[in-house]
């Protein structure tokens, strides 16, 4: 065999080997600037040809482990998210230590640039997994011409969420005290029903800024009936999502409300949409105006109360004649993130459908959230 033919074969083998290495490791730098190889007969070895400018061949780093990028340990090192802004300080209250196991208490990291929803807090469950205490006030007015004859209810409550892992959380979303003043009912005060559950993040994709979470909530019938609580237990499976587009964020939720006693509660389907935009991160860091939409559809009648209005999200009245009716409301407000661990939010909501057909007149919601 001639020396020239031998060199050609060796170059061909080297080229195939280089192509195979590039295919296996996906080296972008190798694909961008192929490295030619020649065979050095005296030394019996392959030699890399230097680029024409005399520079050394470009080095290529080993590819990162895709799973490690989204692990609790990796996410914790980026807490808070580089894209997140805060009004007072981005300093954290702790070093995000690992307690018991990865993800316990710290939950899902890397999504702190999103803004938590405010309106419809009893059923609009956030898709994010974290540990938090949320203090709530709801001032709800009843329509004057509805069957409740006007009036209002003021609700004071707290929600607790505990991250068990970076994907799984325990949630306690309904409790507290209500002061009910409806014209058609005697004034009363008392304890609300208690609701607990769990949620699990099915998808948490930082690269796509997308989270999808499913969960289940169980509402007990322990509340005081004088304030329209304590009538029927309820199971409510839900699915929530979040999608970010730079400073613009969309969150949504779909919830089914299934009474365990079909005679005392209506089957209900509710949904929520939240849109926010961080308008001026340099001059108003951590501040985002928001628009929210809340929908509720009564799917069945019950045999508890002879009414043609339901209980919206406050209660489940088990009304005789509500199947097929719907309520859609719109909320305007904002959330302001003060630090990585504290934020305040408020919305004013009003009905887009005929308010006299249900109990939604208008509502002010205010919250203060502390998170781990």
PLM regions and their residue ranges:
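Cleavable N-terminal targeting peptides that direct proteins into the secretory/outer-membrane pathway or into
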Residues: 11-17
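Transmembrane beta-barrel domains of Gram-negative outer membranes and organellar outer membranes
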Residues: 32-260, 266-372
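N-terminal secretory signal peptides that target proteins for export/translocation
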Residues: 1-11
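Bacterial N-terminal signal peptides
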Residues: 17-27
């Amino acid at each position: 065999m001639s020396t020239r033919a031998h060199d050609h074969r060796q170059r061909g083998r080297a080229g195939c080997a280089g192509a195979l290495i590039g295919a296996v490791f996906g080296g972008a730098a190798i694909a961008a600037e192929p490295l030619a190889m020649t065979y050095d007969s005296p030394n019996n070895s392959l030699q890399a040809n230097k680029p024409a400018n005399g520079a050394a061949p470009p080095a290529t780093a080993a590819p990162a482990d895709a799973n490690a990028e989204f692990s609790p340990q990796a996410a914790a090192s980026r807490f808070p998210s580089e894209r997140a802004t805060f009004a007072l300080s981005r300093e954290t209250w702790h070093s995000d230590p690992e307690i018991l196991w990865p993800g316990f208490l710290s939950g899902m990291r890397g999504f702190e640039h999103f803004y938590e929803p405010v309106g419809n807090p009893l059923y609009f469950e956030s898709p994010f997994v974290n540990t938090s205490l949320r203090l709530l006030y709801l001032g709800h007015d009843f329509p004057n011409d509805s069957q409740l004859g006007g009036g209002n209810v003021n609700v004071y409550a707290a929600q607790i969420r505990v991250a068990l892992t970076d994907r799984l959380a325990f949630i306690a979303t309904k409790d507290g005290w209500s002061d009910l003043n409806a014209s058609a009912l005697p004034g009363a005060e008392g304890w609300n029903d208690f609701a607990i559950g769990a949620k699990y993040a099915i998808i948490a994709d930082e690269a796509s800024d997308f989270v999808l979470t499913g969960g289940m909530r169980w509402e007990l019938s322990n509340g005081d009936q004088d304030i329209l609580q304590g009538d029927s237990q309820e199971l409510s499976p839900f699915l929530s999502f979040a999608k970010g587009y730079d400073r613009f964020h969309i969150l949504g939720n779909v919830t089914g409300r299934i009474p365990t006693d079909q005679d005392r509660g209506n089957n209900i389907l509710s949904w929520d949409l939240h849109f926010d935009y961080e308008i001026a991160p340099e001059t108003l860091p951590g501040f985002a105006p928001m628009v929210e939409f809340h929908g509720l559809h009564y799917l069945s009648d019950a045999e508890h109360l002879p009414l043609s209005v339901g209980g919206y999200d406050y209660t489940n009245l088990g009304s005789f004649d509500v199947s097929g009716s719907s309520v859609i409301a719109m909320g305007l407000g904002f959330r302001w993130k003060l630090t990585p661990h504290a934020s305040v939010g408020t919305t004013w909501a009003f009905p887009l459908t005929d308010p006299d057909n249900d109990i939604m007149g208008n509502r002010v919601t205010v919250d203060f959230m502390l998170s781990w």
